[in-house]
Amino acid sequence: MSLSVEAKAKIVADFGRGTNDSGSTEVQVALLTAQINHLQGHFSEHKKDHHSRRGLLRMVSQRRKLLDYLKRKDVARYTSLIARLGLRR
């Protein structure tokens, strides 16, 4: 299930550099995190939904790649983002 348009707009406004900045690394990671958190609730109820689990693993992998890229390019933005999102690193 995807996020609503309002939820995406709020994430873009919170993490983007401008109002229409939907492509920056921070926004992409924040959107993926929101979708991952939504799917985790889905899997607590639907344990055998392996098709969606594959999509979840793909999103987690994509988020990891984006975070690695951001860490390589700008460590300050990386640490700020993981602190704001509450990720472990």
Swiss-Prot record:
Keywords: Ribonucleoprotein, Ribosomal protein, RNA-binding, rRNA-binding
GO (cellular component) term, any one: cytosolic small ribosomal subunit
Protein's UniProt keywords contain rRNA-binding: yes
Pfam families according to UniProt: Ribosomal_S15
Record-level GO BP terms: translation
Keyword Ribonucleoprotein recorded: yes
Classification via SMART domains: Ribosomal_S15
CDD domains the record matches: Ribosomal_S15p_S13e
GO molecular-function terms, A-Z: rRNA binding; structural constituent of ribosome
Superkingdom in the source lineage: Bacteria
Subunit architecture: Part of the 30S ribosomal subunit. Forms a bridge to the 50S subunit in the 70S ribosome, contacting the 23S rRNA.
Family as reported in the entry's similarity comment: Belongs to the universal ribosomal protein uS15 family.
Function: One of the primary rRNA binding proteins, it binds directly to 16S rRNA where it helps nucleate assembly of the platform of the 30S subunit by binding and bridging several RNA helices of the 16S rRNA.
Name the UniProt record assigns to this protein: Small ribosomal subunit protein uS15
Organism: Pectobacterium atrosepticum (strain SCRI 1043 / ATCC BAA-672) (Erwinia carotovora subsp. atroseptica)
Lineage: Bacteria, Pseudomonadati, Pseudomonadota, Gammaproteobacteria, Enterobacterales
Gene: rpsO
